[in-house]
Amino acid sequence: YENRRKYLDDSPISVVAVLNNADMREEHDIAVERYEQRADELNIDIDVRENITSADLARVFESRNDLVHFIGHSDEQGLECADGFLSIESVSESNTQTFFLNACGSYHEGVGLVRKGSVAGGVTFEAVTDSQAAEVGTTFARLMVLGYSLERALDKARQQVMTPKDYAVVGDGTHVLTQSDAGIPPTHRLVDDGDGYTLKVDQLAPWNKGGEAGEQFDHQEHEYHLNAQHRSYNFSRAELLNAIDIFENPVVYDGTLHWPDELANLL
């Protein structure tokens, strides 16, 4: 929590995507695409690095960055690099605000970054398959730029795989990197009632208790409400499809996280 004070300026958001495993290029390319989607709107600077050395990776963490998304491998020696491994113990200090170490067993390296100055980050406990890592990594990237906190972004992202407990947040999981258009990004849960649908909305956030959040279900202006759990809205199928057409955020339907375009094809 104390590390937040290091990152209170209003400079452009700097994102560094590091690919140190060529087999995971698909995750890397999609993640970069997700960060680029709101780059102009949010003033995000994106730096792409590939197959870098341990010294170069150390400089990435020591430099002022808002998010480092590392894609590769790790073991007890540290994060794998082109010339060996980087142990975070050898990093003088971390000036990287947040991070996602999408590498097998990256927990200890993540804890090390928080101890050396980062606010929070996503890590893994055990070995994860490349396909699982890609699914979690790309979903995490998309949620972060939509304004979700690290904990909520990783929680939703790991719901996409069979072994969600392999992922966790170290540091302050309530930390937010970008601002949502709705003030607080909503959690949408959709229930099929047979003759229609019920959409349940949760927009609580620990930093905005007693505040307001916006919702938009058609092409009109946002409606603003005091933060509260379990607001419910009833829709016909046609009304729901119209609402989904302008959604940016995912919807949990039948126990699975769906993006709006995917959900529209299921209804």
PLM segments and residue spans:
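Caspase-like cysteine protease fold
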Residues: F85, Y148-L267
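Detector for Asparagine
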Residues: N3, N20-N21, N43, N51, ...
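Catalytic cores of nucleophile-dependent amide-cleaving enzymes
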Residues: F70-L150
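A generic structural motif
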Residues: I44-I52, T124-T129, L154-D155
